[in-house]
């Protein structure tokens, strides 16, 4: 425990919070261009081919972004919007692609949780 005199000489240092999504630079989303679209395998014990893409953002960062939902239309040079949110079983993937924004289409035939996958309300 520090004495009053010690605290007068050198106050307590505040802990600096470290961002989980540094490339967003405190913005809710960022726009970027796909430089590579590919699949990768998750950590043990999971098994799949997860769809991801490398994205060059407008601020110069290059990050890996997960493409959620079944099927996508992304290819190299597609302009997409990314948001924060990591994928627990893919090391190094700390961003999600926003479906239904810019060049990324919504998920086809999606009926539930539509707002998360950029799908309009079906007609009747």
Swiss-Prot record:
Q: What is the effect of changing residue 88 to Q?
A: Confers low-level resistance to streptomycin and a 15% decrease in the translational elongation rate
In the UniProt record, the gene name given for this protein reads rpsL
Q: Print the organism lineage.
A: Bacteria, Pseudomonadati, Pseudomonadota, Gammaproteobacteria, Enterobacterales
Q: How does it assemble?
A: Part of the 30S ribosomal subunit. Contacts proteins S8 and S17. Interacts with ArfA. May interact with IF1 in the 30S initiation complex.
Hey, which family's this protein in? Belongs to the universal ribosomal protein uS12 family.
Which regions form coiled coils? none
A Gene Ontology cellular component where this protein is annotated is: ribosome
The intrachain disulfides are none
Question: Which source organism does the UniProt entry give?
Answer: Escherichia coli (strain K12)
A biological process (GO) of this protein is: translation
Which is a Pfam family this sequence falls into? Ribosom_S12_S23
**Protein name per UniProt:** Small ribosomal subunit protein uS12
Q: Which Gene3D superfamilies match?
A: Nucleic acid-binding proteins
Record-level Gene Ontology MF annotations: misfolded RNA binding; rRNA binding; structural constituent of ribosome; tRNA binding
Which residues are recorded as modified (N6-acetyllysine)?
A: 108
Its biological purpose is as follows: With S4 and S5 plays an important role in translational accuracy.
Under the heading HAMAP family, the entry gives: Ribosomal_uS12_B
């Amino acid at each position: 425990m520090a004495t009053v005199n010690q605290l007068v000489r050198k106050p307590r240092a505040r802990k600096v919070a470290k961002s989980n999504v540094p490339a967003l630079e405190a913005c809710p989303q960022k726009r970027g261009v796909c430089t590579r679209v590919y699949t990768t395998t998750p950590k043990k014990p999971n098994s799949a081919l997860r769809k991801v893409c490398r994205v060059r953002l407008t601020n110069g960062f290059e990050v890996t972004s997960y493409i959620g939902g079944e099927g996508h239309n992304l290819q190299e040079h597609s302009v997409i919007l990314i948001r924060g949110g990591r994928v627990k079983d893919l090391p190094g993937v700390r961003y999600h692609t926003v479906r239904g924004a810019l060049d990324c289409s919504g998920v086809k035939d999606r009926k539930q949780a539509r707002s998360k996958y950029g799908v309009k309300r079906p007609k009747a």
